[in-house]
A protein has these predicted regions:
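Glycine-rich phosphate/pyrophosphate-handling loop used in enzymes and phosphotransfer proteins
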Residues: 1-182
Length: 182
């Protein structure tokens, strides 16, 4: 549950109600670089959206959380876009639009550090690195931001902040699983 004073996002939707199993899949995909998980996770995502169509039809666009893949990046592939690309093949009726939020450079990892350290990174270097390169694509729209794991909401808050400043009317999160320290 989000305990942020001003989260900037309306709510968080969680795809999987079996967090340990989904965490294992995310770890294998993201850190083990087993890219075959992209299709599986894309199918799971579309199944979740289809089952709850009434809840998600209100969103105008579904985008990915910001990932940096340039020089000095920790990972040279956009694991969230691969999932949304797979989801778009399974559910072309959903308004998937990866990459509407840009991250201009690498930031420190959140995995394995304290919530206070994650908050400092989010409110410092992450906030400074985020932008919306094409604001016309989100102005006046309700945006759903897809990410793999939700911990305390620090990253999502910063992405919601930049989207709202660029003209989005509402921002919510959509994550595969929740895990403290994820």
């Amino acid at each position: 549950m989000c305990t942020l004073d001003d989260p900037f996002f309306a709510r968080i939707h969680t795809v999987c109600d079996r967090p340990e199993e989904m965490w294992d899949a995310v770890m294998s995909y993201k850190y083990g670089e087993d890219r075959s998980w992209a299709d599986v996770l894309g199918r799971i995502l579309v199944g979740f959206l289809d089952e709850r169509r009434e809840d998600f039809e209100r969103y105008d666009v579904i985008t990915t959380g910001a990932i940096y893949v340039g020089p000095r990046a920790q990972r040279l592939w956009d694991y969230l876009s691969l999932i949304l690309d797979a989801a778009a093949r399974q559910g072309p009726h959903w308004p998937f639009a990866p990459g509407l939020i840009a991250k201009s450079g690498p930031t420190a990892r959140f995995l394995g550090i304290s919530p206070q350290a994650r908050q400092r990174i989010a409110e410092g270097e992450l906030r400074a690195a985020l932008s919306v390169p094409a604001p016309a694509r989100i102005v006046g729209r309700r945006v759903l931001v897809f990410d793999d794991v939700y911990s305390e909401g620090f990253s999502l808050r910063e992405m919601a902040r930049v989207l709202l400043a660029a003209g989005a009317t509402e921002v919510a999160g959509l994550v595969l699983t929740r895990r403290k320290g994820g």
